[in-house]
């Protein structure tokens, strides 16, 4: 992939950009083999890739510069701003949004936050696009509610320019730290969730719910999990760290009992909305800590699917799963190193199959799906 920002030495986020996609995939596959060394694997499935560019559905932009000439992108450690509006990872549909937002910031009087001076209001712009219908969610991350009245007053102009903006919010992040968002979310539109659809499964994206940033590869990941579960005798399933329910909603059947657990209430609201649309009455989603939920249960499902953050599921949950001994475990991970550590804490399970998904091209990161069977 050609990138003017990389060539100019202004951005180094895509550290593997000089390698071909095939070279990247080979290196990631070798890394996964190294991490699982000593753990017998029955079947290595062919890795799955996706588009080389324009694949991201989300932009996280630091806002710097002045209210008359705002700059969207990132800050180097020395405070130097870099404009990332031309990043080739973003779809072409983002460009007109960025263009309209620059004069809008002046209209609304949203002074960009100055990190060195600890002054200003607008810290970040968070933009998400639905692959399903092109609808977008825009979040203004502000230091305080001081400019809310001005922001609301200026919004009709922005919505006339960009009718694709379905969900608009103000997120309040008052702390002088590099934290992307705060706890308070103020909706500025009637619509509060963005509709998405993978493999004919309706999904919803809310402001504070995690959603994969590479929809093409994510849809293939969910479809693969559905295929694997469909080949197993599963009538009762847990989906831990379930997010908006992508895995569980793909894998569930009308006959299956499924419980999805996620600590973020916004994500659970999305999952419940999708389950209702699908008419799946035996799906239950709850906003709880996944480890605390699992260790408090007295019943054993046929299959436990886990999709933890980068830290993995950890030894306490591994120990409990080993003791509870469900027949199958599916582990989806964005950090194969912690996944490999966790699997080594499950000695009574063998790896039936593994598949790598290149969710993050031009970086060393990747997603991996692993099916474990009780011995």
Curated annotation (Swiss-Prot):
EC number: 2.1.1.189
Chain sites annotated for binding S-adenosyl-L-methionine: 212, 241, 262, 307
Amino-acid positions noted as binding [4Fe-4S] cluster in the UniProt annotation, renumbered to this chain: 3, 11, 14, 87
Molecular-function GO terms, alphabetical: 4 iron, 4 sulfur cluster binding; iron ion binding; rRNA (uridine-C5-)-methyltransferase activity
UniProtKB keywords: 4Fe-4S, Iron, Iron-sulfur, Metal-binding, Methyltransferase, rRNA processing, S-adenosyl-L-methionine, Transferase
GO biological process: rRNA base methylation
Active site positions: 334
Catalytic activity annotation: uridine(747) in 23S rRNA + S-adenosyl-L-methionine = 5-methyluridine(747) in 23S rRNA + S-adenosyl-L-homocysteine + H(+)
Enzyme class: transferase
Entry annotated with the keyword Disulfide bond: no
Entry-linked Pfam families: tRNA_U5-meth_tr
Entry keyword annotation includes ATP-binding: no
InterPro entries: 23SrRNA_MeTrfase_RlmC, MeTrfase_TrmA_AS, MeTrfase_TrmA_CS, SAM-dependent_MTases_sf, U5_MeTrfase_fam
PANTHER family: RNA M5U METHYLTRANSFERASE, TRNA (URACIL(54)-C(5))-METHYLTRANSFERASE
Cited HAMAP family: 23SrRNA_methyltr_RlmC (MF_01012)
Family classification: Belongs to the class I-like SAM-binding methyltransferase superfamily. RNA M5U methyltransferase family. RlmC subfamily.
General function of this protein: Catalyzes the formation of 5-methyl-uridine at position 747 (m5U747) in 23S rRNA.
UniProt name for this protein: 23S rRNA (uracil(747)-C(5))-methyltransferase RlmC
Species per Swiss-Prot/TrEMBL record: Salmonella paratyphi A (strain AKU_12601)
Taxonomic classification: Bacteria, Pseudomonadati, Pseudomonadota, Gammaproteobacteria, Enterobacterales
């Amino acid at each position: 992939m050609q990138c003017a920002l990389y060539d100019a030495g202004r951005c180094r986020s895509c550290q593997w950009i000089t390698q071909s996609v095939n070279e990247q995939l080979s290196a990631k596959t070798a890394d996964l083999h190294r991490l699982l060394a000593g753990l017998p694997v029955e079947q290595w499935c062919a890795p799955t890739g996706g588009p080389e560019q324009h694949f991201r559905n989300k932009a996280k932009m630091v806002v710097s510069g002045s209210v008359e000439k705002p700059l969207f992108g990132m800050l180097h450690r020395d405070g130097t701003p870099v404009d990332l509006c031309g990043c080739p990872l973003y779809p072409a549909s983002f460009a007109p949004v960025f263009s309209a937002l620059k004069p809008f910031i002046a209209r609304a009087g949203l002074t960009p936050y100055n990190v060195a001076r600890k002054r200003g209001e607008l810290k970040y712009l968070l933009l998400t696009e639905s692959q399903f219908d092109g609808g977008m969610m825009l979040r203004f991350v502000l230091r305080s509610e001081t400019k809310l009245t001005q922001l609301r007053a200026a919004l009709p102009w922005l919505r006339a320019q960009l009718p694709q903006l379905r969900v608009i919010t103000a997120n309040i992040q008052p702390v002088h730290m590099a934290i992307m968002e705060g706890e308070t979310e103020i909706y500025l539109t009637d619509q509060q969730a963005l509709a998405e659809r993978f493999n004919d499964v309706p999904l919803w994206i809310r402001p504070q719910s995690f959603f994969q940033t590479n929809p093409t590869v994510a849809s293939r990941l969910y479809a693969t999990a559905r295929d694997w579960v469909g080949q197993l005798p599963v009538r009762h399933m847990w989906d831990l760290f379930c997010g908006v329910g992508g895995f569980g909603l793909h894998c569930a059947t009308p006959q299956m009992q499924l419980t999805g657990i996620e600590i973020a209430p916004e994500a659970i609201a999305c999952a419940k909305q999708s389950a209702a649309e699908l008419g799946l009455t035996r799906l239950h989603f709850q906003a709880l800590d996944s480890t605390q939920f699992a260790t408090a249960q007295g019943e054993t499902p046929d299959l436990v699917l886990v999709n933890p953050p980068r830290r993995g599921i950890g030894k306490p949950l591994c120990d409990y799963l080993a003791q509870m001994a469900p027949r199958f475990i599916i582990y989806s991970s964005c950090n194969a190193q912690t996944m490999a550590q966790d699997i080594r804490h499950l000695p009574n399970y063998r790896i039936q199959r593994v598949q790598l998904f290149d969710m993050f091209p031009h970086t060393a990161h990747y997603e991996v799906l692993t099916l474990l069977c009780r011995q």
